[in-house]
């Protein structure tokens, strides 16, 4: 799979989560955004929302369920916009918004 195919899958995932997180920005990050993907790479997708509402353990599982309905390669992560973490910084620096 190439970067463009990974972007198409990430876009399909974005459409799948719109009912849950209509205000989310979705980024492809990791090996596909950096051009270092290989045959066994997963598709790293960051779902960035203005504010995480509710219990983490109740809001994250639906993201995984939707991911599996699109592709078993998707590895979603939920983030709050502006959070202070190395992963968030990496997504903002190297991620591709879809």
Could you describe each region identified by the protein language model?
Residues 27, 44-46:
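Short, well-ordered beta-strand segments
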Residues 1-25, 34-39, 50-98:
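Catalytic core of pol beta-like nucleotidyltransferases
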Residues 29-31:
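Glycine-rich beta-strand-to-loop/alpha-helix junction loops that act as flexible
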């Amino acid at each position: 799979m190439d970067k463009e195919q990974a972007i198409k899958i990430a876009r399909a995932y974005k459409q799948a989560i719109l009912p849950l997180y209509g205000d989310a920005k979705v980024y492809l990050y990791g090996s596909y955004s950096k051009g270092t993907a290989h045959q066994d790479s997963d598709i790293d997708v960051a779902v960035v929302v203005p504010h995480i509402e509710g219990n983490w353990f109740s809001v994250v599982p639906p993201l995984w369920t939707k991911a599996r309905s699109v592709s078993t390669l998707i590895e979603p992560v939920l983030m709050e916009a502006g959070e202070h973490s190395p992963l968030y910084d990496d997504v903002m620096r190297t991620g591709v918004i879809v």
